[in-house]
């Protein structure tokens, strides 16, 4: 699940991100987006390159790829991850990285056939500015492709323990995460559910031929939780076993929740509920009683620059 971690953290670069895409689904998208004709692609907010590394083999054989991130550390590691993933002649000279801010890219207008991002806009205080920059550097008739989640719903996904919860607890939980999300936005930390807004933003920015897809990957958990994907999904849960606050950073949650209009009393009640839920989940996992279908809403939205 793509929880609303601080974008500066590295929680979202855990192993689970390696299972984000089914290979045959990527091949289908590559076909829909006609990536075989694409000779230049820019990945904005590339992080360690998880997204563009997957798209790279589908591009035209001589295509060049530019990964951009504002953090130097990520682009250095992204370069390494391309080197590790592809034999040198494949990527040599074709893949480059640049440190730049998504809202003020140091790139000429009308440069790339495709400009894309995965979970970048959700971290921007002004996501529309980021989108406009992506469009600016796209060639006329080129495509903009954004992959962004709807994390409020992902946080509320049900599992085998949900039927034990009373309705009031679930309603409170929704209010809690809604206030958390709104507080994040108010503090300029980005909208963790921005996926829902992308089609409208694309239309407002003047893109045409807008198409919207949903990622087809789910992260199911069921006993005995044995395969590598399930282990990767559970890995953070194991790491959180030793933490007093479970998976949650109390100070961060507090900041966002209060900024979203929540009260200090509700914060403490809700935080204990979260801790209890986390402990119940761990107990159920160890007893083989926990299961979840593991769906998460992640939109892929593409549009063409006129
Ligand atoms: C959640 S990570 C996603 C990384 C990568 N796209 C992926 O899917 O694995 C968000 C990335 O956006 C970068 N980022 C956040 N704000 C940015 C900005 N204003 N300009 C450029 N990069 C930014 C972060 O440094 C981070 O690498």
Q: In which residue ranges do the predicted regions lie?
A:
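C-terminal helical/coil "lid" or tail adjacent to the Rossmann-like core of SAM-dependent
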Residues: 2-12, 213-293
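Conserved alpha-helix/loop element of class I SAM-dependent methyltransferases that forms part
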Residues: 19-39, 54
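Class I SAM-dependent methyltransferase SAM/SAH-binding core
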Residues: 40-44, 48-104
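A short acidic, Gly/Pro-enriched loop at the edge of an enzyme's catalytic core
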Residues: 103-115
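A short SAM/SAH-binding and catalytic strip from SAM-dependent methyltransferases
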Residues: 113-128
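Acidic carboxylate diad motif detector
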Residues: 146-148
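Conserved catalytic/acceptor-binding region of the Class I
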Residues: 150-247
